[in-house]
Amino acid sequence: MTPDVTLRFERRLQHPNQRVWAAITEPDEIEAWWGRATVDLRPGGAMRIEWLNSDVTMPATITELDPPHVLEIEGEPHGRLRFELEPDGDGTVLRFIARSPVPDDFLSKVQAGWHFHLDALADFVDDGTRIDWPNWPLDRWQAIHDTYYSGELDSERQSSRQAAER
C-alpha cells in the first residue's frame, strides 16, 4: 500500500480574499488555471475537475466549506485538497494542502503539478492569463519538476511523509 503524502504550498497573492475565492470556486475561473469544472458550492456538494491536458478527471465531494476562507474537497485520484485563504493587508495568503497516496517515483511530478497550477492561479488573478490547455507550457512544468527531482527538497519530502503518518 502506498502511504499518504501531505504536500503544503503557501503563496501571498496581491488580491483581496473575495477575488481569490472566486478563482478557486467559480467554474469559468477554475478552468483558467486548473481544468474544466462543475461545482455545487455547498457542504456535501459535488465538484468535478477535468484536466484539459490529459485524460484525468477528479469527481470530488466538498468536505468543508467556509466562504471565503476554506474550501476542502476529497476525491480520486488526488485525495484531499484544501484551500485556505487568509486576508493579509491588501492581499491574501493562500495555503494549499494536498494529501493523497503518492508513490516515491511519482512524487516530484505531483509536486511540480500543484506548483504549476498555483503559479497559473497567481498569473490568472494577477492579469487574467488563462492556460491554453491543448498547448500548455510543458517546458514551464518541466523546469519546476527538475527543481523538485534534483533532490533539493529531500528534507521537505521526508517531513511531508512524516506529517502524513501522524
Label each region the model flagged.
Residues 38-41, 48-103, 165:
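Hydrophobic-ligand binding "helix-grip"
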Residues 21-24, 33, 51, 65, ...:
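Tryptophan-centric aromatic hotspots in well-structured domains and transmembrane helices
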Residues 17, 43, 137:
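Solvent-exposed, flexible loop/coil residues
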